[in-house]
């Protein structure tokens, strides 16, 4: 670049720096504006195709979900009053309606020792054997001589944690006595907790040995400090299904009706059974159909925005979508719409309109909820046949979309091409900057040379004038 001392025209009087800057800017501006437009348009298209690809992928996800046969094989179970029981079902359950009456809930064992005086300590060491059920091998816990009731409790809980039995102290503020209370883990008849103390620790006993050598348990008499026994006895749940009397060791019943699990909550009113209903999971299918419609409508909305021209006022230029005139986008929607009106192989439900899904003027889908509910209730298998399988609607729609979203597909090729264009803009801008810099250097040199030439001409002119003035006979005019 020319030396800065030569930028202003000393001899010519010209502002060379400003002249060169103006000429360079005039040369650069059109190309720079062209590159900016190209970069802006390309970036908008790149973003638009990314949005389109995302919308298509979302739609494909729900298409694949609706094409899964297991979606239509699912079963749902419900009860007429969840205050008394709740129910769930697997695909193995057969549709049906059952009457359930609950007369007794399953319960875990809760037992208590006789009362211990305030400040009690064991007089001798020994062992306590705790069993859950008379036939249980039990857990033996060592108790040291002089142990407080709290220390005995802590030793018990440390040894019983794997068995799930817990020991707590309940104090009587009236007389200062305390009892050890044991709570079992497992519900069901025969799961009562028994405690047997070795010699010197018999006051911890809960349950007695009968004449046959078996343990028996009596109910605790809360008014007697010497009484031990059960507060709550371990019991089976008792209930009936359609009049058949049944029992379960837990309140979770899963082997009475194939594929159905129900959770008993409380005893039902006498002679007022509740209803358990097992049916196809119509709610789950409907939710997925709604997701399909939402995803399709999102795709329509995205394409409309990207390909539309929106007026914003008489005095303003319209808003033009990034993909206006893009044939691939138009072809995508046209292909989808054509596929959706092709009849399926079924007889009752052959297309979306048969189940209450129709196309609005703007190209989006809408659902007639009442019609859809009725079709799902009366023609569930026909809906499954329309949607699923290699020739089902969901697979056909997915096949139309795959060429656009697959690796190396239509949209990926477009994105790659646009990325190349963005890179080329950067390359062209670098080349333009180099040309402009070269032009600026050249113009500065040319204008500097011109200014120097003018200086030389001025000097020559001055010398000639001086020489002429000194010639003989030359008379100067006054």
UniProtKB/Swiss-Prot annotation:
Question: Which InterPro entries does the UniProt record give?
Answer: Flagellin_hook_IN_motif, FliD, FliD_C, FliD_N
Look up the domain of life of the source.
Bacteria
Q: Which family does it belong to?
A: Belongs to the FliD family.
Q: How does it assemble?
A: Homopentamer.
GO CC, one annotated term: bacterial-type flagellum hook
Please cite one Gene Ontology biological process associated with this protein.
bacterial-type flagellum-dependent cell motility
Q: What is the lineage of its organism?
A: Bacteria, Pseudomonadati, Pseudomonadota, Gammaproteobacteria, Pseudomonadales
Tell me the function of this protein: Required for the morphogenesis and for the elongation of the flagellar filament by facilitating polymerization of the flagellin monomers at the tip of growing filament. Forms a capping structure, which prevents flagellin subunits (transported through the central channel of the flagellum) from leaking out without polymerization at the distal end. Essential for motility. Responsible for adhesion to mucin, which is the initial event in colonization by this organism of the airways of cystic fibrosis patients.
Coiled coil residues, start to end: 409-460
Q: Does this UniProt record's set of keywords contain Coiled coil?
A: yes
Q: Which Cys-Cys disulfides exist here?
A: none
Principal localization reads secreted
Q: What is this protein called?
A: A-type flagellar hook-associated protein 2
